[in-house]
Amino acid sequence: ITIDTLYSTAKVSFNSSRKKDLWILNDIEQESLGQIEPTINYLKSFKAVKDPCVIESINNFPTAAGLASSASGVASIVIAINEFFNLNLSEKELVDAAILGSGSAPRSLYPGFVHLNKKDYSCETILDTNEWPLKIIICQTSSDKKLVSSREGMRISKLTSSYYEAWVNDQDNDINKALKAIKTKDFDLLGEVSEDNCKKMHKVMETSQPPLIYRNLTTHLCIQKIKEMKFSGIGIFYTIDAGPQVKIICKAKHADQVISEMKSIPNIQDIIEVNLGQGARLINEG
């Protein structure tokens, strides 16, 4: 799901005084390009650009804390470089560039409910922003940077978790259920497959060596509160990425009640209500 309110911006410029590219993230110069280097090199290869450039990225929400900052961040960089160098890349080429930096980034190029096809890495919007106007309530339980990144965590899990293979083998079945639920706007089915897939992913991480424990006590309190609301008849479900933050999806008519209930949980740092959002786009040509 692409959302509004939480977003990343990117600005690109030349700097002839430098010998190599520079990435500035949230006003802090990074020691290297890190995971975005393959994306930068791929994009610059279209015009054989050799001059060093400066990429300035800003996330308006905590970075590397389980809120998909790499997805939105890489997507914004792809759009910025495509415009700066006048590459005029196709949608498929933009997706190819984004996925080199983050496996989640292609989805942030598109609006609404987005499907990334594993066969050819094509990407498409299944339902646009206004076609199924659900609410997403983000419960931030920590702003700390993860001790183990999602990418490194996945590598560890692949090598050490006895549940990894079964989780991967279930993905086709889960994605088909999710696609059916989204296309038919079956809220209960989408909630069922989303929560089940989330639980399986965290089972894989927590059975890795060393165990990858991303959820905290407040995360579990949020889950318990969600279960109570669901039992009382509220249309609601949750998902949690590789981090401690809880994302609640609910019907618009229940949003105020959900927020009120979640405020009763101790140690929640912030509760953010968002809608489905637009894909990555150019906002300033200057």
Describe the predicted segments one by one.
Residues 35, 73-74, 174, 218, ...:
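Catalytic-loop motifs flanking and including active-site residues across diverse enzymes
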Residues 238, 243-250:
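Short cationic amphipathic helices and targeting signals
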Residues 10, 190, 241:
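Residue-level signal for inorganic ion chemistry
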Residues 1-65, 79-89, 258-261, 272-286:
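ATP-binding N-lobe of GHMP and related small-molecule kinases
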Residues 1-2, 128-130, 238:
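Short Gly/Pro-enriched turn/cap motifs at secondary-structure boundaries
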Residues 48-130:
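Gly/Ser-rich oxyanion-binding loop with an adjacent helix/lid
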Residues 12-15, 234-240:
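Short, flexible, solvent-exposed loop/turn segments with mixed acidic/basic and small polar residues
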Residues 93-234, 249, 253-286:
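ATP-dependent small-molecule kinase catalytic core of the GHMP/sugar-kinase superfamily
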